[in-house]
Amino acid sequence: MLGAIAKKIFGSSNDRRVKGYRPRVAAINALEPEMEALSDEALRARTDALKAELANGKSLDDILVPAFATVREAAKRVLGQRHFDVQLIGGMVLHEGGIAEMKTGEGKTLVATLATYLNALAGNGVHVVTVNDYLARRDAEWMGRIYDFLGLTTGIIVHGLDDAERKAAYACDITYGTNNEYGFDYLRDNMKYELGQMVQRGHAFAIVDEVDSILIDEARTPLIISGPIDDRSDLYVAIDALMPRLAREDYDLDEKQRTVSLTESGNEHIEELLREAGVLKEGDLYDAHNITIVHHVNQALRAHTLFTRDKDYIVRNDEVVIIDEFTGRMMPGRRYSEGLHQALEAKERVTIQPENQTLASITFQNYFRLYKKLAGMTGTASTEADEFQEIYNLGVVEIPTNRPVERVDEDDEVYRTAEEKYAAIIAEIDKAHARHQPVLVGTGSIERSEHLAALLERHGYKPLDYSNASAMEEVYAAARDGRVTKKFAVLNARFHEQEAYIVAQAGVPGAITIATNMAGRGTDIKLGGNVEMRVTQELAGLPEGPEREARIVAIKQEIEENRAKVLTSGEPADPAAGRKTGLPGGLYIIGTERNESRRIDNQLRGRSGRQGDPGRSKFYLSLQDDLMRIFGSDRMDGMLQKLGLEQGEAIIHPWINKAIAKAQQKVEARNFDMRKNVLKYDNVMNDQRKVVFEQRREFMAQESVRETVDEMRHGVVDDVVAQHIPEDAYPEQWDIAGLRASIENQLNLDVPVEDWAKEEGIADEEIRERLRKAADEAYADRVTRNGPELMAYVEKQVLLQSLDHLWREHLVTLDHLRQVIGWRGIAQRDPLNEYKSEAFELFNGLIGSLREQVTGQLMRIEIMMQEPEAPSLPPMFAQHLDPVTGENEFFLPEGSGSFGAAGGAYGYAAQGLNTEGAVLERDPADASTWGRVGRNEPCPCGSGKKYKHCHGRYAAEA
């Protein structure tokens, strides 16, 4: 009560913050006459003048007013659009690293140009982030005209570009692209082997459009670059065939938490079925050697119980394609991890793609926190303000609309069954269509949008292709004549190619559009129709000239007439029905269910009432809807029955809206907690990721990594000595045999450690120093034989590829640890602290393994120098096999072996050892094929002796 009174007197904190921007808005407005007086050349020259001011010590804040005034004037000249005062405020919020909440149609795309231009003047690059390739291209081409006019360059990052094109786009002053492309480029950059191959040039400032969709809805979804592993398709198919044989009591399903697990009886039943099918051959299901089968069973169970076709995914062209639960868009190329996608493919009887191993991954939460400054725009952020502040340190500012919102948001109508609800929706669509009022019907899934489409067809409506010019002309003719067409369009993941047409024309008189969640659609619904879309569609083949201009004028005039019809298409007052006042015209939003998030509902509502237009929104619900069913519909159903609610009757009351809003708040709070928890765990990996990626970058930046290689070699010596000669131990307690074996295995050295150990008074420190010296001399000899320049290249490749190999294994290990760490809670131990502790130990192990792997490879590698001009030589390559596992550890790319030397060039083919001790590409019977052989390497003849004790001895004697 007191808070409400104080707010009336003093205004909200948001009002006060907005008021704080007004003086600078006035200053920008004061510069407008001066800017209008400048010629195009003089206005363009403002960019260089502002850059000079920055170079002379001024800050971006110091030049904000003239920079914004410059952009406003450029937009007027190039686009014919002038930034409103509230848009200037939005630009200031973005520049300060905040989130500007702006209603639909308030010009977010134009607002971004202000902060983008100002920050681009610093020369560090600005990334503008959109949710799909279409919007990235559209905004870059549209707003790029302003930047080009002012002398700045614009690049676009979309799917399908090669590295050279990406690098050029990132080198521009301003880069537009999708969140996925930015994230994947970052991961790919950190898998490159030369700095010059990296495409991104840093993370200075990013403006994220639809920021709530990217940083909230997709926060839990990691970006993953993966590689294929063994084919297990037979196992997926075999286990999938058993799922229909499970009874409902065999598993516990929690739709609220989206979890499923086998019951005790279910475990016994599935074990019996697995034995019958021959999948479980020995032991019990939960024996250690059967853990893979358990994993596949769990994923198959999830696929059958938690994932629904045409809601969570669709099947298209023999593929399972994920559907974004928040936007309804298809996400081709995205795959569920941990074998879940393969389980879905087995369920749907499509080709099972190989399972993948994670090579690199990052969440959007951690990627966007790389930026020194981050800002965002959306129409709906205030409901998630706490999360933006806590996780990203982003404050939300609600920007006032340029004109008051005239949309009427009605109370929900709640029916007992879905059948009654859909009957009411069809009746409401009929009434609106008869008045020529355009209707946008929002659904939660493809399945429901197609169900509603089928119901409309049963009631005499026909589907319409909005991208078909002749079909649309029929709609426009009906609008001119005042006829109803009884046509509708469906916008979901199946018809995403027509998205721009469908959304742009959804404001035509009498239009009926069924759409899955409207988050991130990015195209405004303009009452009467969209001029640009109609010109593109109808005049594509008409050249510039008087006829084209006349047609454009006619289209504009018709759209204005249609707009007038839509504005007057509201429902008149009906005193008999208890409605004393009429309901407005404009776009009518009908929601067929409430989403888990209030924000998604608000996004749907926000499609109507843009820029002061009238509009109307209403949600039709049933107790069978997901949200109502999961959150206590049984109690409400009993209450409605007691109230004597007849079939087809609805209950309408503000209390119902409040109860639903509370249920949504519960879900939002739960999802926030889940995202926070995910972030806590991911932060552990993120800290390690930053260390590894930074170390990689340092290695690539160095001309030589010899110093690092030497330190690693010394570290291996120290570890070996410490392992076999305990501190303060007596000589008779030393494990000299083990020490010798480790020296030969890890350092490829043959030294008389037994003799050293027998010397009077010798200490472990002396042995350590002798081993270091012997290892240094052996490596120096190898460098001399192979050539310092070439060895420097090989050292860097071995170091980078060994680090990558171990990092990939580390990611898998951390992932497995994360899956099981929750069980520590049963023992009253904090799983997060346990995870941090064990992840730290694993990371230390990675560092130790890197030392050993790099040292072991470099102490064995031999590089055969060959003349490059020899025509019979095969393509040059380098490879080295791990001396223990025989795995191929690194490859030098073809053609990368040219090194200037004495006016010529060298080719190389580095050869390593296989596990039997034979040198690859060498004929044991022909010594002329052996090339140079290291003294401590196995003799190529196959005797099993070291070269120095076999043919090397004969060569020395000779």
UniProtKB/Swiss-Prot annotation:
Subunit structure: Monomer and homodimer. Part of the essential Sec protein translocation apparatus which comprises SecA, SecYEG and auxiliary proteins SecDF-YajC and YidC.
Catalytic activity: ATP + H2O + cellular proteinSide 1 = ADP + phosphate + cellular proteinSide 2
CC cofactor: Zn(2+)
Gene Ontology CC, one term: plasma membrane
Listed EC numbers: 7.4.2.8
Positions in coiled-coil regions: none
Function: Part of the Sec protein translocase complex. Interacts with the SecYEG preprotein conducting channel. Has a central role in coupling the hydrolysis of ATP to the transfer of proteins into and across the cell membrane, serving both as a receptor for the preprotein-SecB complex and as an ATP-driven molecular motor driving the stepwise translocation of polypeptide chains across the membrane.
GO biological process terms held by the UniProt record: intracellular protein transmembrane transport; protein import; protein targeting; protein transport by the Sec complex
Species this chain originates from: Methylobacterium nodulans (strain LMG 21967 / CNCM I-2342 / ORS 2060)
Keywords: ATP-binding, Cell inner membrane, Cell membrane, Cytoplasm, Membrane, Metal-binding, Nucleotide-binding, Protein transport, Translocase, Translocation, Transport, Zinc
Membrane-topology descriptor: Peripheral membrane protein
Molecular function GO labels: ATP binding; metal ion binding; protein-exporting ATPase activity
Ligand binding (Zn(2+)): 939, 941, 950-951
Keyword Lipid metabolism found: no
Binding of ATP, residues: 87, 105-109, 524
Family stated for the protein in its record: Belongs to the SecA family.
UniProt-listed SMART domains: SecA_DEAD, SecA_PP_bind
Chain segments annotated as transmembrane: none
Entry's localization field: Cell inner membrane; Cytoplasm
Designated name of the protein: Protein translocase subunit SecA
